[in-house]
A protein has these predicted regions:
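Bacterial N-terminal signal peptides that target proteins for export
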Residues: 1-7
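N-terminal signal peptide c-region/cleavage motif recognized by signal peptidases
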Residues: 14-16
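C-terminal/domain-edge helix-coil "capping" segments
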Residues: 20-36, 43-45, 64-66, 72-76, ...
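Active-site-proximal beta-strand/loop segments in catalytic clefts of secreted hydrolases
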Residues: 39-41, 81-82, 119-120
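A short, flexible beta-alpha/helix-coil linker loop
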Residues: 43-48, 84-86
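Glycine- and acidic-residue-enriched helix-capping/strand-helix junction motifs
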Residues: 48-61
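Short, well-ordered secondary-structure micro-motifs
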Residues: 48-49, 90-91, 128
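Short, solvent-exposed, polar/charged sequence segments at loop or secondary-structure edges
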Residues: 72-117
C-alpha cells in the first residue's frame, strides 16, 4: 500500500523515529527545592537549677527528629548538618553563641534561603519549653516563631515537639517560597 507515493514501511519508520526523538527530548528540569539549614537546637539552662546528665541527650534527640523530618520532605532540600555545624563553629570562634544574626549569616554562607534554630529550656522538673524560629536568609527576618510546652517524659515529648515544628517549617516554606 502506498501513501502519496511513499511506501507504507517508510511512513511507519519515519513516524517511529519522530516519536523516539520527542520521547528522548529532555523534559524541563523541575524547579529546585528551597534549601533550609538547621542550626542544632541548644539547651538553655537559664531557668534550670542544675544541668542534669540527660538534658543534652534530650536536646540531641529533638535536633535529630527535626533534621529527620525535614530531610524526609519532598518540598525542600536540607543542607548537610555537618556543613552547617562547621559554619556555626567558625562563627562561634569568638566565644559567643550563634544568635539570630549568626544563624542568618550561616544560612547565607551554606547557600540556604531558610534557616531554623531554637532552644530547649528546662523550666522545672516536669515542664520543658521548645522555642524555635525560621528565618528568611534573604531578608534576615523571622517568618515563623513557635513555642511548645513539653510536659511529661521530655525524652519522648521533645522530639515530638520538634517534629511538629518541622512540619510547620515545611508548610511555611511552601507558602512563602514561591513569593
Amino acid at each position: 500500500m502506498r501513501f502519496k507515493g511513499l511506501p507504507l514501511a517508510f511512513l511507519l519508520i519515519s513516524t517511529a523515529a519522530r516519536a523516539q526523538t520527542s520521547a528522548s527530548a529532555p523534559s524541563p528540569a523541575p524547579s529546585p527545592r528551597p534549601a533550609v539549614a538547621v542550626v542544632n537546637l541548644r539547651f538553655d539552662g537559664e531557668h534550670a537549677n542544675v544541668l542534669q546528665a540527660g538534658d543534652t541527650a534530650i536536646v540531641a534527640a529533638a535536633t535529630s527528629k527535626l533534621l529527620a523530618t525535614l530531610a524526609a520532605s519532598d518540598r525542600l532540600a536540607l543542607v548537610d548538618s555537618t556543613t552547617v555545624a562547621t559554619a556555626v563553629a567558625v562563627a562561634e570562634g569568638s566565644g559567643n553563641p550563634c544568635d539570630n544574626a549568626c544563624a542568618v549569616a550561616v544560612a547565607r554562607k551554606v547557600g540556604a534561603r531558610w534557616v531554623a534554630k531554637g532552644t530547649i529550656s528546662n523550666l522545672s522538673n516536669l515542664v520543658w519549653l521548645l522555642t524555635a524560629e525560621l528565618f528568611d536568609a534573604t531578608t534576615g527576618k523571622p517568618v515563623l516563631a513557635d513555642s511548645y510546652e513539653i510536659k511529661g517524659d521530655a525524652a519522648r515529648m521533645a522530639p515530638a515537639a520538634a517534629h511538629v515544628f518541622a512540619q510547620r517549617v515545611e508548610k511555611t516554606i511552601a507558602e512563602k517560597g514561591s513569593r
